[in-house]
Amino acid sequence: MTREHASPFALRRRSLIRMGATLAAAAPLLHARPGAAASDPKIVEAARKEGSVSLYSSASTGPSNAIAEAFRKKYGIPVTVYRAGSADVATRVQTEEAAGRPQADALIIEEPALTLLQPFLAAYDSPERAPLAPEYKAPDSTLIRMYVSQIGWNTQMVKAEAAPKDWPDLLDPRWKGRFGSLDPHVTATTLAWQVMVGQLYGPDYLAKFGANRPKLYASTNAMSQAIVSGEIEVGITNSFGVIQMAETGAPMAGVTPKHTVLFGGNIAVFAKAPRPNAARLFCDFACSAEGQTVVNVAGATIPTHPGASAPAAGNLAEMSKVHVFSQPDHKRIIADTQKLLAEWEKHVK
């Protein structure tokens, strides 16, 4: 299977609907207690001898720490988490590999950074991913969590009827200096959004977007905090950021524009993992219904395992009926990264 088939960005609309239908058909399972991961006892024993796991993750702090702690409780193996934006994670991995001193065992990351790091990943067909649809599996990675781009706003500062509902609405002068965006230098997923709006609205969109002077943030968490604190009124964020804030009672709401990007968080094992057995055991746990429930409940994201449950994240089948998901070519985005960043820097200051 090619990398393009492994990622929801590259899947056609009918495949997304079919994937959503697969999860919908499993609805009775979604409310059941997730089954426990059942890894090879020999791998468990070898992993315990290795003593720990080093996880590099671009997922938010909540889900990254939650799955690390759940793994520790289950196997007695501590997990050290390095958490950063996908661009920073990729840079750290490349730097360590170039120096001949790889430090990480396992990886949780989104595209296009996943494709960028593919040369450093090991093929691993975890037994725990057997129930997953083929679209979620590549030889060297497994899709375990999904979320979409949204527009979020502070409900105390912006009335719902006045809030921007689509990407062109952000060009309205009323939002000048009062809205935010994730920084593509730190969070590479912003490049996928940049490609999407360029295709939808033409090259002038980014110039008009920049003229409205968005404030830039390094993570979804930082963006959400800025919105609820009133530092900004509106922001381009992700569905999980809105859900998590709303669940705490914070003054934040959001909307998914008709055209949006469906992002996916993937689990992978490094080819030169210092602790290869612990890496595989962690991957098994992350792929399982048990592990996916932990990471997706903590992250307010959509699981790919039919036995996992994260009700707050929404239903992919229903979303597929009303939304058109962007399908950027990740290899092309990687090849054009410097060009895309130069275009961003030209207009967004």
Task: Give residue ranges: language-model regions.
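A bilobed periplasmic-binding-protein/Venus flytrap-type ligand-binding module shared by bacterial periplasmic
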Residues: 150-157, 194-195, 264-278, 294-297
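Extracellular/periplasmic bilobal clamshell ligand-binding domains
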Residues: 312-349
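Extracytoplasmic ligand-binding site segments that recognize negatively charged/polar headgroups
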Residues: 54-68, 80-97, 101-231
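A ligand-binding cleft/hinge motif common to bilobed small-molecule-binding domains
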Residues: 112-118, 233-251
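C-terminal segment of N-terminal export signals and the immediately downstream linker at the start
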Residues: 9-11, 28-49
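Periplasmic-binding protein-like
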Residues: 134, 147, 175-185, 207-210, 216-217, 286-309, ...
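N-terminal secretory signal peptides
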Residues: 1-15, 19-31
